[in-house]
C-alpha cells in the first residue's frame, strides 16, 4: 500500500524535459509521413505548416532548430491524438494491438512486467514508467475520474512514443 502523505506528486523538471525531448524526436517521423497521412492528422493549420517546413529543410542546423520548434508546438496541439495517428501510421495493425496490450498489463505492483517492458523498449525508462503508473494509482486513491482519464491517456501515449522511438533506433 502506498503512503500518499510521503509521496511528492509534482512532476519533476527532468521528467518534463524528457517528455519534451521525446516529442522533438517524434517530430522527424511525423514530418516524414506521406501527404495523405499528414492531411489526416488532427492538428491546426499553423502546426501543419511548420511540420511540412521541417520535411523540406535539408540544412542540419536549420533542421535541428525546426525539430525543436515542432516539438514545442506539439505540446500546444492535442499531443495524444497526434501520437496515436503517428503510431497507427507507423506500425501494422497486428503490432499495434500487441504494443497496446502493454497498457493493461503494466501495474505499479508488478516490477517484473515493468522491467520486461523497459527491456523490450529501450527508449523507455523504468522511473518514467513508474511515475506514470503512480499517477494512475493516485487517481484511484483520490477517486478523481478526470485525473484517471488523463493519467491513462498519458500512459498510453508514453507506450506509443517509446515503441516508435525504439523502432527508429533499430
What is the role of each PLM region?
Residues 1-72, 79-170:
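Basic, alpha-helical nucleic-acid-binding regions used in initiation and control of genome expression
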